[in-house]
Amino acid sequence: MDVQPLLKKLGEGKTLTVDEAYRLARGILLGELGEVEVAAALTAMSVRGETGEEVLGFVKMAREAAVRVPLEVDAIDTAGTGGDGAGTINLSTAAAIVAAAAGAKVLKHGNRSASGLFGSADFMEAVGYNLDLPPEKAARLVATVGFAFVFAPKYHPAFAKVAPVRRRLPFRTIFNVVGPLANPGCVKRQLVGVAEPRLLEVVGEALAGMGHVKALVVHGGGVDEVSTEGPTTVVEVRGFKLERYVVSPGDFGAPVTPLPRARSREEAVARALAGLRGEDREAAVAIAANAGFALYVADVVKDFRDGFELALKTIEEGAAYRKLVEAVEASR
């Protein structure tokens, strides 16, 4: 395909429309562009800052190229862009498990860590989850167990075409934002954490354009999670409406608590498991905070306070850890 007009437009600092971004993403993911062209496009967007329309165009193509999970239930996903360098445990994955134990249907989509301590796939693999889950089984587990994890490389094989270029670029690209939004089950409800405040509206606009029923984009004072250390900025998406506001731990009934951090993968796994068992208070509170937001997105609860209370109760009563064990066993 002839992308020269699009590259010229990007080189001039101009933004792409949704359709133009879709066509560029199509050329990249189908392997029709050379590495120099791909690098030029990704660099131009990264330097200028990706727009909601550009992210939406790329997500549309990514979903089109994905192996589809044939969901028959209204499911949610919890994911973050990563890259915050905060060294926290994988809260979005643990929160997804708690949300499932508390009544939400969850299709968790994730990958190994590219730069941080460990990603969602690293955690799920560490606890014995089968990462080679076929799409039909994933859909069945969401309906019956309430939780399934799908490994991004298995469901987005086209992303492999751009991997060599991404590895050579010394900065994050639009694909770091697209990945968390490209759930192969095409869920209509998501909790998305972003590492940069500027991405709150960018991701919110993309989610609105994707036709989401309800979604939250969060940035917790430097981390791509709901923070228990201080304020979290939220962009709530309902249909095509975006609303921005700030919440503090006390607003949803949580004590101000340090976020659980780890210095090794082993410690990160251990703290996440201890949090799910209610044995690590810092981890349990942070996991419950994020799970509470997920339960709000799933419409299991009416507000964040009810969500936090239900999530913490689910952890303290042992249901969260039992759900993890059940999910791991069902995946095999």
Curated annotation (Swiss-Prot):
UniProt pathway: Amino-acid biosynthesis; L-tryptophan biosynthesis; L-tryptophan from chorismate: step 2/5
Pfam families the record matches: Glycos_trans_3N (PF02885), Glycos_transf_3 (PF00591)
Reactions it catalyzes: N-(5-phospho-beta-D-ribosyl)anthranilate + diphosphate = 5-phospho-alpha-D-ribose 1-diphosphate + anthranilate
EC code(s) of this entry: 2.4.2.18
InterPro entries listed in its UniProt record: Anthranilate_Pribosyl_Tfrase (IPR005940), Glycosyl_Trfase_fam3 (IPR000312), Glycosyl_Trfase_fam3_N_dom (IPR017459), Glycosyl_Trfase_fam3_N_dom_sf (IPR036320), Nuc_phospho_transferase (IPR035902)
Enzyme class, spelled out: transferase
Binding positions (anthranilate 2): R166
Keywords, comma-separated and alphabetical: Amino-acid biosynthesis, Aromatic amino acid biosynthesis, Glycosyltransferase, Magnesium, Metal-binding, Transferase, Tryptophan biosynthesis
Binding site for Mg(2+) 1: S92, E225
Cofactor note: Binds 2 magnesium ions per monomer.
Any single GO BP term: L-tryptophan biosynthetic process
Cofactors: Mg(2+)
Binding-site list for 5-phospho-alpha-D-ribose 1-diphosphate: 80, 83-84, 88, 90-93, 108-116, 120
GO molecular function: anthranilate phosphoribosyltransferase activity; magnesium ion binding
Gene Ontology CC: cytosol
Binding site for anthranilate 1: G80, N111
Binding site for Mg(2+) 2: D224, E225
Stated role: Catalyzes the transfer of the phosphoribosyl group of 5-phosphorylribose-1-pyrophosphate (PRPP) to anthranilate to yield N-(5'-phosphoribosyl)-anthranilate (PRA).
The family this protein is said to belong to: Belongs to the anthranilate phosphoribosyltransferase family.
Subunit (UniProt): Homodimer.
Protein name per its UniProtKB record: Anthranilate phosphoribosyltransferase
Organism of this sequence: Pyrobaculum calidifontis (strain DSM 21063 / JCM 11548 / VA1)
